[in-house]
Amino acid sequence: MRVENGIATLHGAPEISVLLRRSGRARRLSLRVSGLDGRVTLTMPQSLHLSTALEFLRERESWLRTAMTRLPAPCPVALGADILLRGEILRITEGCGARIHVQGSQLRVPPDPTGTRTALRVATYLKASARAALVPASEKYAAALGRPFSAITLRDTRSRWGSCTAQGRLMFSWRLIMAPPAVLQYVAAHEVAHLKYMDHSRTFWTCVAQLMPDYQTHRDWLSNNGAALHNYCFTSRPEADNG
């Protein structure tokens, strides 16, 4: 095992990098594998000696390797591959025009002789589609709540689907456009509700229910299926949109 710059590397096939994280709140050692990106984190109490944590990691290496094999394989975005858009599976195929568009059960993309631009083009298309859906959804719920927001930003976040700052700035993951439209609407309602309640109290959830009475169904969909949206692998990702 090699330890460098807060990363422990387990030798073998394949090598596994483990982020070593100290936490003042941790009372015991905890080894976790992210279902979103496969990242491995070993969390330890502040006062625990590093050698104890590394021994814990060695003892659980077999479990860790088994857990890694159970992670879903990434889905490269390329010609001939499938992708989700608004909850529907579309096949990425080559079109003859200069713009991406949906045609039946296909996502038609411009010709890409080198095979190097399709993923970025699709990601950019998804991001634009997400903005076109999230802006009016947020405006609708903000108007219903009587609380305006100051800006909307789209990012490719892995730890959360959206956020709301005290300054009224809303942030959303553009991958929400892959989910069914009602799921995207739920996240918009959720974040807009934070314009009034900056917590997850019972009052907050009552507010969400007022904006979207059947929100729980869509929240459950995201809990059960959201990780799959992160399996799609784009060779290049669009920059954050601060518009």
Q: Language-model features: where?
A:
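Walker B catalytic acidic pair
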Residues: 191
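Active-site-proximal or metal-binding-adjacent scaffold patches in catalytic folds
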Residues: 1-186, 195-243
